[in-house]
From Swiss-Prot:
GO cellular component: ribonucleoprotein complex; ribosome
Lineage, opening ranks: Bacteria, Bacillati, Chloroflexota, Chloroflexia, Chloroflexales
Pfam (any one): Ribosomal_S8
Assembly with partners or alone: Part of the 30S ribosomal subunit. Contacts proteins S5 and S12.
Keyword terms: Ribonucleoprotein, Ribosomal protein, RNA-binding, rRNA-binding
Keyword Transcription regulation part of the UniProt annotation: no
InterPro entries noted in UniProt: Ribosomal_uS8, Ribosomal_uS8_sf
Record function comment: One of the primary rRNA binding proteins, it binds directly to 16S rRNA central domain where it helps coordinate assembly of the platform of the 30S subunit.
GO BP annotations listed: translation
NCBIfam families: PRK00136.1
GO MF term list: rRNA binding; structural constituent of ribosome
Top-rank lineage group of the source organism: Bacteria
Organism of derivation: Chloroflexus aurantiacus (strain ATCC 29364 / DSM 637 / Y-400-fl)
Protein's recorded name: Small ribosomal subunit protein uS8
Length: 133
């Protein structure tokens, strides 16, 4: 099956798995998805992720979701911002704050995929991929 928006598909799979209280979610892997998963892990939104290579041409990324002690998901919401039909770019000075700084904005910059505070520190702007809170 062809997916027009792989990042949107990734976010939807994570959102659906959180709502269904699944412990893991798997999807086809790519470098961009791995970079997003790395940021989500570093920021504490997911427990872990692993890229599994089956030896053929297909790689799979498996994300282990994180839940709070009362069984609520650590990820309350995900929103795709820049879409294939409408790309959204921002300057360093205009990087949006998500939920008053409690959320996370993930950007694709010339220095790689970065969280909002990392892009600010690196003094770069870029494409706003998604918001996570």
């Amino acid at each position: 099956m062809s997916v027009n928006d792989p990042i949107g598909d990734m976010l939807t799979r994570i959102r659906n798995a959180c709502m269904a209280r699944h412990t893991t979610v798997s999807m086809p892997a790519s470098n961009m998805k791995e970079a997003i998963a790395r940021i989500l892990k570093r920021e504490g939104f997911i427990r872990d992720y692993a890229v599994i290579d089956d030896g053929k041409s297909h790689k799979t990324i498996t994300i282990t979701l994180k839940y709070l002690p009362d069984r609520r998901p650590a990820i309350t919401g995900l929103r795709r911002v820049s879409k294939p039909g409408l790309r959204i770019y921002t300057k360093r000075t205009d990087i949006p704050r998500v939920r008053g700084g409690l959320g996370l904005c993930i950007l694709s910059t010339p220095k790689g995929v970065l969280a909002d505070h990392e892009a600010w520190r690196e003094r770069v702007g870029g494409e706003v991929l998604c918001y996570v809170w």
